[in-house]
Structures are given as structure tokens and as C-alpha cells.
């Protein structure tokens, strides 16, 4: 990303990176604010440090942002990547279905095992898996860098708490278990990391630069970028492609630059695109062929139809996964002479019908509908006399759990007291 928010993050990142001893020159580091709606940050050798706009927006002061970036630089300074037993893994930062279908989420079920084999698409960014000891060492190094830079070292504990709270909120929104978030975690649980970081930081004073931080990130895009499509509850709309569809009840959507994942307790899926030569039946066969490198997926037959005036074709393959049978469905739409989109879904045998409403909901949106799609943005506001948690939360651009979202975004609790003149973050259109 470019712009004032990216420039601000770059400045903070370089200031904390030079505390690592990797280099004393700020110019030796490249700090990038990524246009992603996922909470993540990472660094790689060579002075490259990355943080997503979504994670930056979760911070509540500059010290917290510096702590996150310092933690990631700490991994590089301690040469954790070189010490790992396995090489860097390609993990979905932007919603790839491979992660959604992994055994980490689905366990050893037939659905989970087959999902690990056949789905590997979606947009990805490099993230690194570290051991428990390495994560703890990076936390400690981040705290050291905060102290050297004059920041309040306790910021490391507060940002870890915010991440744990965001993770719990995400799980509640999705109706899933409280999965440990990618950045917050790899092995140590967030609660223990919060306690350890607070103990390590001690009572050393330092600045937080809250006002500078809030001014620096004010106006940043929050959540999905319309250029990549917008998820609003169970509805996905892409103004560029003039497309919209509705996920089935009980399913949630995760958006990415190249794939939209659909996940629920009884099935998973994604919407993606592939090279299209003008023949939908051939397209469906090609998608099936590309889904698995370990076993051949052949649909029983391919049928053609129309959905809301859009030419479509679909097929189903029943597969033995070892723990039972599953159905894999590919449902494709001709969007133009050289463009097609398709759903790929997986569910236990006989349950693929739960996706029928989604397949039939695909439609082209009008120009006016496309124009009406607006991004959510972070807005820093000043609390006025008479404002309450409830009144401010009601201004959030969400219909689901606005209060919970407001509290997590601002690091507050339901018992927090507001004072006139205090600044808080809102998400607005």
C-alpha cells in the first residue's frame, strides 16, 4: 500500500528495526503495509518487514505497533528461520481454501483428510512457523527493542491481549471454536504470552504515542477492499466483476484476492477462476483435474443449466477418503467469452445439496449496485459529553455484534468508562 498510513507505518517500523542490531541504517529496512483484511505480520531476512492494515488497525498506540514489528524483526535477528526444522511454509494469509480445509480445523475426519489433499488454491503470502521457544524469544526481543526505542514495553502484553480478544470475536462471529490466530500464536497460548510479556516488561516507563498513532492510521481501509470484493455477513459482492452470491445459512465467508472461501460445520468450498477457452464442460473437467495431485477426481457426469440467465455447468465426484465417502462438486459459470468462475465444494457424501441455494444465488449486479459498494474505513473520533459505549458502538458499520467489535477494536471492556475528549476508533462507510 501507499499513502499517509503506509508512510507512517514505515517510519515506525524502521525506527524499531534499527534497535535490533541487524543494521544501524534505517534505509537498510523495507517496511510495507499490506492491503489485506487479515491480522498478520512477518519479516524475512534482508530487512523486509510486513504488517497488514487490518492488524495495524487493531493496535491502539504506536508502542503496540512497534512491538508487533519488533517481534517479527526479532525472529530474523535470532535467525529463527535458519534454525527451523522445516522450511518456510506457504500459508494462506488471504483466505485460501487449503487452510480452511486443513486437518487443523477439521481434525482427522474424512472431510478434513481429503480437504488437505485436494484444495491448494487461493492467494498466499509467506508466513513462518516457529517453535514455542522461538516465539517467546521473539516476544522478549520485541520488548527489548521497545525499551531501547523509549516505548512503553508493556505494549507487547496489551497487543497480545487485543489479538486474543479479536480471535475470540472472530470465532464467535463464525460460530467456531476459539482458534489461535496466525500471528498471535504459533504454539504458546495467548494468555500465557500476555502474562510472560507483562512480567518481562516490568515497570519500565516509556511513551505510547497514542495520539500520533491514531492520526497516522486514521482513514485506513478496514476489512475487505472493494477491488477484491466485499463480504457482508453471508453475502459476497464484487463490484468489478459485477457479481454477487449468498452463502448458505450457517456458513461464513473469507475473502482473498484470488479466492473466496466458504466454510461451515458440514462442508467447505471456495469461489475461484481459471483459464477459460469457451467450453464450460471442458472447464469443469479441467477444474476437477487440478483439485488433486494425489487422486484422480472424475465427475459422474457434467450437466449444463442457466442460473439467473448465466450459462452454467456442474458435476459431482464421490471420493473414498479412508474414513468415508465425500462429495466434491464443481459448479461453473460463464462470465464472458473468455472468463468463467466456479465454486468447488466438499461435503460428506449425500450432503452436497446444502450448497444448492448458493449455486443458484449467483447473479450479475447492476451498475448502480456496483457503484453503491463502499469500503469500510477506520475513523478516529473524539468522545463528547453524553457519549456512551452503546451510542458509539451503534455508529459501527456492522449489524452483527457492533458492541463487541467496538470494544475489541479499542481495547475496551463492557465496564470501561469513557471521558469527554478521549479518542476512540470506529469503523464507518
Residue ranges and their predicted role:
Residues 1-106, 127, 141-178, 182-183, ...:
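Peri-catalytic and regulatory segments of divalent metal-dependent proteins
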Residues 66, 251, 343-375:
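Surface-exposed amphipathic alpha-helical segments
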Residues 225-256:
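N-terminal "mature-domain start" segment
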Residues 229-236, 260, 307-318:
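Short, hydrophobic/aromatic-rich segments at coil-to-beta transitions
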Residues 367-400, 422:
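Primarily a LysM-type cell-wall glycan-binding module
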Amino acid at each position: 500500500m501507499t499513502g499517509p498510513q503506509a508512510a507512517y507505518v514505515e517510519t515506525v517500523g524502521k525506527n524499531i528495526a534499527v534497535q535490533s542490531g541487524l543494521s544501524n541504517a534505517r534505509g537498510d529496512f523495507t517496511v510495507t503495509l499490506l492491503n489485506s483484511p487479515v491480522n498478520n505480520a512477518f519479516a524475512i531476512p534482508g530487512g523486509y518487514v510486513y504488517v497488514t492494515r487490518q492488524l495495524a488497525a487493531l493496535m491502539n498506540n504506536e508502542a503496540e505497533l512497534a512491538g508487533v514489528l519488533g517481534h517479527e524483526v526479532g525472529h530474523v535477528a535470532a535467525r529463527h528461520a535458519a534454525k527451523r526444522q522445516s522450511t518456510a511454509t506457504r500459508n494462506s494469509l488471504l483466505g485460501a481454501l487449503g487452510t480452511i480445509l486443513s486437518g487443523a480445523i477439521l481434525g482427522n475426519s474424512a472431510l478434513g483428510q481429503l480437504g488437505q489433499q485436494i484444495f491448494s488454491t487461493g492467494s498466499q503470502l509467506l508466513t513462518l512457523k516457529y517453535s514455542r521457544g522461538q516465539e517467546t524469544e521473539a516476544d522478549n526481543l520485541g520488548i527489548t527493542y521497545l525499551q531501547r526505542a523509549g516505548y512503553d514495553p508493556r505494549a507487547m502484553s496489551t497487543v497480545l491481549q487485543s489479538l486474543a480478544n479479536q480471535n475470540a470475536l472472530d470465532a464467535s462471529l463464525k460460530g467456531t471454536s476459539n482458534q489461535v490466530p496466525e500471528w498471535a500464536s504459533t504454539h504458546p497460548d495467548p494468555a500465557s504470552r500476555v502474562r510472560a510479556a507483562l512480567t518481562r516488561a516490568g515497570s519500565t516507563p516509556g511513551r505510547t504515542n497514542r495520539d500520533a498513532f491514531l492520526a497516522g492510521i486514521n482513514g485506513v481501509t478496514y476489512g475487505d477492499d472493494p477491488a477484491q470484493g466485499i463480504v457482508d455477513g453471508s453475502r459476497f459482492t464484487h463490484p468489478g466483476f459485477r457479481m454477487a452470491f449468498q452463502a448458505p445459512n450457517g456458513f461464513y465467508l473469507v475473502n482473498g484476492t484470488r479466492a473466496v472461501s466458504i466454510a461451515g460445520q458440514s462442508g467447505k468450498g471456495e469461489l475461484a477462476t481459471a483459464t477459460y477457452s469457451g467450453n464450460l464442460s471442458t472447464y469443469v473437467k479441467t477444474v476437477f483435474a487440478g483439485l488433486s495431485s494425489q487422486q484422480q477426481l472424475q465427475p459422474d457426469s457434467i450437466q449444463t443449466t442457466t442460473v439467473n440467465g448465466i450459462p452454467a455447468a456442474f458435476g459431482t465426484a464421490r471420493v473414498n477418503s479412508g474414513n468415508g465417502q465425500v462429495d466434491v462438486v464443481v459448479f461453473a459459470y460463464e462470465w464472458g467469452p473468455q472468463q468463467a468462475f466456479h465454486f468447488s465444494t466438499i461435503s460428506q457424501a449425500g450432503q452436497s445439496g446444502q450448497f444448492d441455494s448458493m449455486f443458484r444465488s449467483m447473479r450479475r449486479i447492476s451498475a448502480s449496485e456496483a457503484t453503491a459498494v463502499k469500503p469500510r474505513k477506520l475513523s478516529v473520533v473524539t468522545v463528547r459529553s453524553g457519549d456512551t459505549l452503546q451510542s458509539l458502538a451503534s455508529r459501527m458499520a456492522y449489524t452483527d455484534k457492533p458492541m463487541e467489535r467496538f470494544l475489541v477494536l479499542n481495547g475496551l471492556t463492557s465496564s470501561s468508562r469513557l471521558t469527554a475528549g478521549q479518542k476512540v476508533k470506529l469503523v464507518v462507510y
